[in-house]
Regions:
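Glycine-rich ThDP/TPP pyrophosphate-binding loop and its adjacent helix/strand module
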Residues: 116-310
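Conserved acidic/glycine
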Residues: 1-56, 242, 247, 252-325
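Cofactor-binding active-site loop characterized by glycine-rich and histidine/acidic residues
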Residues: 32-170, 188-194, 199-206
Length: 325
């Protein structure tokens, strides 16, 4: 881990957080009540990733052009960290024709063919798709890698287990990532499984499994690096579970009554100020650097917001575009 790596990780985490914070603000404008998905400038539901940034930046730091990611209904952090264009992504979230899917997909169905990025609101759906990417890479004889991301709730789905088994049998270059934020919507882990680490399940499929803490972004970086290197070398799949924290609701408008006293502890678990403090203590960052990095991120986000707001809204005729059957 070099100083440059550390700065890059921190900057990307801040960039993602400022993006999500601005969406939070824009999404709630003109929405009364907060969960009215038909009101405001941004249609549909909204699932934001605040608190889970280290998972995305730590993994994506090892990916290169041509590697593939399949993400979840909470996809923004992985999309941005993987190089998806912020302007086109935000235009899609606003439902504009300049968006990644011409405004037809929305925030849960982002698709970027150039960067091999996709996501879905269907739980565990991305795992089989990532295996398909990995199989294609293997047959072509490239060193490309696929990354499949899901939450801990999806680890009890059949598609999760089928994908791990298939990837191990076929020795596919895929890294399975579980973001464990302790809640499958409002269901705590203890109500759905008796195990304390999904990483332990990897052994049953003959692959390495490791669990790391989200608040240690450098630990995420190291674990992801080992898994990606293994896949590129033709040594097969790995499983990484990242114990993370969801700072905001499952969706915007979620009252989070089920979290109880945990809500009072979230600020001290925020990974961005934790990492900033560590970098300041080690002399890598200063308070002025922190302010400058945030201002730079805010400027990029503002430019993307203005691009989205000034982009056309689809017409009725646009509904027939890209319909083939």
């Amino acid at each position: 881990m070099t100083t440059l790596n550390q700065l890059d990780l921190y900057k990307e985490m801040v960039r993602i957080r400022q993006f999500e914070g601005r969406i939070l603000q824009e999404y709630h404008a003109d929405k009364t009540p907060a969960w009215d998905i038909g009101a405001g400038l941004i249609p549909g539901e909204m699932h934001l990733s605040a608190g889970q940034e280290p998972a995305a930046v730590g993994v994506c730091a090892h990916l290169k052009k041509g590697d593939a990611i399949t993400a979840t209904h909470r996809p923004h952090h992985f999309a941005l960290a993987h190089g998806v264009d912020m302007k086109a992504m935000l235009a899609e979230i606003y439902g504009r024709t300049t968006g990644l899917c011409q405004g037809k997909g929305g925030h849960m169905h982002l698709f970027d063919a150039e960067n091999h990025f996709s996501c879905s609101g269907i739980i565990a759906q991305g795992y089989p798709v990532a295996c398909g990417h990995a199989l294609a890479f293997k047959r072509r004889g490239t060193d490309q890698v696929a990354v499949a991301v899901t939450g801990e709730g999806a680890a009890n789905q059949g598609a999760f287990h089928e994908s791990l088994n298939l990837a191990a049998v076929w020795n596919l270059p895929v890294v399975f990532v579980i973001e464990d934020n302790d809640w499958a919507i409002s269901v705590p882990r203890s109500h759905s499984t008796s195990n304390t680490s999904n990483a332990d399940r990897a052994a049953g499929y003959g692959m390495p499994g490791v669990r790391v803490e989200n608040n240690d972004v450098e630990a995420v970086f190291e674990a992801a690096g080992a898994a990606v290197d293994r896949a590129r070398a033709g040594e097969g799949p790995s499983l990484i579970e990242i114990h993370t924290v969801r700072l905001w609701g499952h969706f915007e408008g979620d009252a989070q009554a089920y979290r109880g006293a945990e809500l009072d502890t979230l600020d001290v678990r925020d990974p961005i100020p934790i990492y900033a403090a560590a970098l300041i203590d080690s002399g890598i960052l200063s308070d002025d650097d922190v302010a400058s990095i945030q201002a730079e991120a805010d400027a990029e986000v503002e430019e993307a917001v203005q691009f989205a707001l000034n982009s056309p809204v689809p017409t009725a005729d646009d509904a027939l575009l890209h319909v083939f059957a």
